[in-house]
Amino acid sequence: MKYNSVIRKAIFLRRPNRFQAYVVLDDEELLVHVPNTGRCREILKEGCTVLLRKGTTPNRKTPYDLIAAYKGEILINIDSQIPNKVVEEALINKKIEKLVNFNNISREKTFGNSRFDFKLQDDNENIYFLEVKGVTLEENGETRFPDAPTERGKKHILELIEIKKLGMGAGIIFLIQIDNVNKFSPNDETDPKFGEALRLAKKEGVDIFAYNCKVTEEEIELLNPVEIVL
């Protein structure tokens, strides 16, 4: 998907809280919005180059959103709203092999006590629930999720297991918002319970996908599946 707004480059200074950051744009210090509540400590370091997207709401306190950052030569998209849009585009364009038969795509559907990112249905009325997780934590070509403990993430996985037991399809896709990575694993060091739940889900037949992305200063799109090591 292409960014449908003005993109500017800036220099990252600091992040006083989860939702805001200070950058230097056109030689002036500016407060911007960070659309990602994760820590991103390995990415947002003082002096790194970041990408800003012009906000569409007039008169808001932060005129730009900080949507991506360079980690050395690697551009990482950190906008938490992007993964669902990228996956939806991939589903429509039949880029996820196991899900190509699902033509009916619905967003934000509830089952049990959870709301899932996608509810899919094929021509035979088979139902499949799909949850999307954006991945930004990378080291030496290997990626992990989450970068902070996530009780909600574990809850989603356990609900997917129940969906599978009821005879419906269930899957979780880790969208790695980075190019040139070759492996994905749960971050057991940060959240061992999430890793335990993911391994249980695999055992119970829940599909686990991990895809990297083509990330440029103009667009981001789903690229290739990567190795999953549980």
Swiss-Prot record:
InterPro entries xrefs: SfsA, SfsA_C, SfsA_N
GO molecular function terms noted in the UniProt entry: DNA binding
Q: Which superkingdom is the protein from? A: Bacteria
The record's comment on protein family reads: Belongs to the SfsA family.
Checking HAMAP family in the record gives: SfsA
Protein name per Swiss-Prot or TrEMBL = Sugar fermentation stimulation protein homolog
The gene behind this protein is: sfsA
